[in-house]
Amino acid sequence: MIKVGIVGGTGYTGVELLRLLSRHPDVELTAITSRKEAGLRVDAMYPSLRGWVDLAFTTPDEANLAGCDVVFFATPNGIAMQEAVRLVEAGVRVIDLAADFRIKDIAEWEKWYGMTHASPQLVAEAVYGLPEINRDAVRTARVVANPGCYPTAVQLGFLPLIEAEAIDPASLIADCKSGVSGAGRKAEVHTLFAEATDSFKAYGVAGHRHLPEIRQGLAAVAGQPVGLTFVPHLTPMVRGIHATLYARLKKDVDLQGLFESRYAGERFVDVLPAGSCPETRSVRGSNTCRIAVHRPQGSDTVVVLSVIDNLVKGAAGQAVQNLNLMFGLPESTGLEIVPLMP
C-alpha cells in the first residue's frame, strides 16, 4: 500500500482528495494535517466522509509525514515551498495542488504571487503534472506541480491545435467561467450566497495568476511565446469550469478528426460528436474533461468548448491521476467515477 499524507485537509481540494483517496484500493491514508483543527475527527468536519475516513486532524509537527511515500499539499500558495524540501530530502515524493512549483520563471512567479520563493531549486526539477502532456516525466518525478483549474481546461482545449500548427499562437482568447468553489472555503463577501447567486461577473480582467501558467504551458508546446487574452468569470454554481476558446486558423484542417485522434487514448478527455456543446454538469464529481470543437459558418475562427469539474480534473482528481503515474498504477485507479446527475 502507498502511504499517503495530506497537508491542509480542511479546504475543498483537501476534502475532495479525501473523498477520492478513501476509496483508492492501493492507498493507505496515514496523516491529515491542520493546525487550526488539530484533534478534530475528519468526519466531524465532513459528515460525508463518515465510515470512509477514520482519522483526526493533526498538526504538521505531530504528523509523521517523513514516513509517507507521498505527501499532497492542499494548502494556500506559499506553504509547500517551505515544507517540501525536507520531505524530498527524506525520500518522500510531493504533489503540490497550489501554485508554488508551477511557474519556472522565479521572478515571474514572485511578481504574480507577491512573495519571495523559498525553494527555487525544487521549481527547477518539479514536473508540471498535466498527464496528457507530461505523462512520462510525471512517472519519475520527485515533485509534481499539479496544474490549476483554468489552466487544465484551457491547455487541453488548445493543445491539439497548437501541436498541429493549425492556429496562430499570437492571438488566442480564453473566455472562462468558474463555480464559486474555485475561490476556496474561506469566508469572503463575494462568494456569499446572497452575493454570488443570481449574478454573473468577470474578474481578474487586467491579469489573473493563472495567465502566466497557461502561457508557459502553451508556449512549451508551440516552441514560441503565445499571445493570450484570458478573462475569467464567476458564475452562480458550486462546481465547474467552462472554457470557451477562440483562435485563428492558419490552414484548413479536419478539426473533429484532429481532436479525436489526439485524445483517442486519453481516458479522461472525451471529445464529443461534431456540433455538441458540453455542459459543466456532465462532468460534475468526475475526473473527465469534455471537449467540443466548432468552426462557425466555415470561417477561419475555431471555437473550442472545454468543461471540467474544478475540484476534480482541475485539482484533486488530477493529483490522484499523477499519484497513479508516479507509483506505476493504472492511471484510472480510484478515478472511475460516473458524474453526478442532476
From Swiss-Prot:
The gene is argC. It is an enzyme of class 1 (oxidoreductase). HAMAP family: ArgC_type1. NCBIfam families: argC (TIGR01850). PROSITE patterns: ARGC. It comes from Laribacter hongkongensis (strain HLHK9). The keyword Amino-acid biosynthesis applies. Pathway: Amino-acid biosynthesis; L-arginine biosynthesis; N(2)-acetyl-L-ornithine from L-glutamate: step 3/4. One of its GO terms (biological process) is L-arginine biosynthetic process. Catalyzes the NADPH-dependent reduction of N-acetyl-5-glutamyl phosphate to yield N-acetyl-L-glutamate 5-semialdehyde. This is N-acetyl-gamma-glutamyl-phosphate reductase. Keywords: Amino-acid biosynthesis, Arginine biosynthesis, Cytoplasm, NADP, Oxidoreductase. It comes from the Bacteria. Pfam families: Semialdhyde_dh, Semialdhyde_dhC_1. Its EC number is 1.2.1.38.
